[in-house]
Regions:
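Generic beta-sheet signal
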Residues: 40-42, 77
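Catalytic His-Asp segment of secreted/periplasmic serine-dependent ester chemistry enzymes
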Residues: 47-129
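Oxyanion-hole/transition-state-stabilizing segment in secreted/luminal serine hydrolases
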Residues: 1-25, 30, 42-47
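Short amphipathic alpha-helical segments, especially helix-boundary/capping motifs
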Residues: 38-40, 111
């Protein structure tokens, strides 16, 4: 029906996307006026502390975009993931949870991270002009 909600959430980068800058720039350019964008930072625990990894570089670029555009916000899943090592035990360090408790906890943390960014964006009220 060609309806796009005012707040758009985009998660990009856990699977290696070498042209992340180009893709993010295109998405921002094509985002219609009257909308805001929430970028969910990627997390890959295998390379989380490697500044040369694509996931880390993607996160850095997303943080830069949020500073550049007042209608772009960040749901920093990377930061949340780093702060909660308990959800990664027994996993591939990309997909949280190795049993019901940690799967549930990881899902709740992810949802809370995105919701906090949405709440902040809506409170600020800025959209693309």
């Amino acid at each position: 029906n060609k309806v796009l909600l005012e707040t758009v959430v985009l998660a990009l980068g856990t699977n290696t996307v070498d042209n992340y800058e180009s893709l993010l720039n295109q998405f921002i350019a094509k985002l219609p006026k009257g909308h805001r964008l929430i970028l969910v930072t990627p997390y890959d625990g295998r390379t989380a502390h490697d500044g040369t990894s694509i996931a880390v570089k993607t996160r850095q670029y997303e943080l830069e975009l949020a500073k550049k555009y007042d209608y772009v916000f960040v749901a920093d899943w990377y930061q949340t993931a780093i702060q909660h090592p308990e959800i990664w035990y027994g996993t591939d360090y990309v997909h949280f949870g190795s049993e019901t408790t940690t799967i549930t906890k990881g899902g709740e943390l992810y949802a809370q991270t995105v919701k906090q960014a949405i709440d902040e964006a809506v409170k600020k009220g800025t959209v693309k002009k």
